[in-house]
UniProtKB/Swiss-Prot annotation:
Entry protein name: Cysteine-rich venom protein
Gene3D superfamilies with a match to the protein in the record: CAP (3.40.33.10), Crisp domain (1.10.10.740)
Tissue and organ distribution: Expressed by the venom gland.
Keyword field contains Disulfide bond: yes
Amino acid sequence: MIAFIVLLSLAAVLQQSSGTVDFASESSNKGENQKQIVKKHNALRRSVKPPARNMLQMEWNSRAAQNAKRWAERCSFTHSPPSLRTVGKLRCGENLLQSSQPLPWSKVVQAWYDENKNFVYGIGAKPPGSVVGHYTQVVWYKSRLLGCASVKCSPTKYLYVCQYCPAGNIIGSQATPYKSGPRCADCPSACVKGLCTNPCKREDDYSNCKSLAEKNKCMEEWMKSKCPASCFCHNKII
């Protein structure tokens, strides 16, 4: 989801209150900026309310960053097609922001997160129809790989793109982007400052794999092939 009018208005307010920033200095090609982008995301994921029991810690992914850069350079100001948002077998989500002036990455990520003012856990957007998809992607529990890029499309148009793998905003689950509960309750032995560090790196092909696994279907070969996460990722965040 994207709503440039809302995000542009917010970006303009943030820019006016924070002064100018050198666009080149915020390049996501720089290692220190990559670390800051990841740090900002993890800080926000750690601070969700209600707290999350299964929120994975994010890390930078160069392939996702390359995909984000290639798309940003097109200056199309629309979401990239899913076929251009993959890292290995993972399908990735995407957040965009357009600004009339350059912004520090911390402000960009915060702008996405601030949609939480119109989000109620377990209910979703409130009032109904409010734009909250950028927020829910930032805090989607399973999105653990992150790559971002920005481009100056014109003197008054700057585009910021982040891709998240695996993708969030799964249809039917947007109101619960994570499981609420005590921080790290689902990963007590793999927790760093409230974030889980034990992701399952396998992906199920079907949405009902978990229920099938609970019925001891993992003894069957087709199940092992189509539901590897549910069958093999014990004590991991799936």
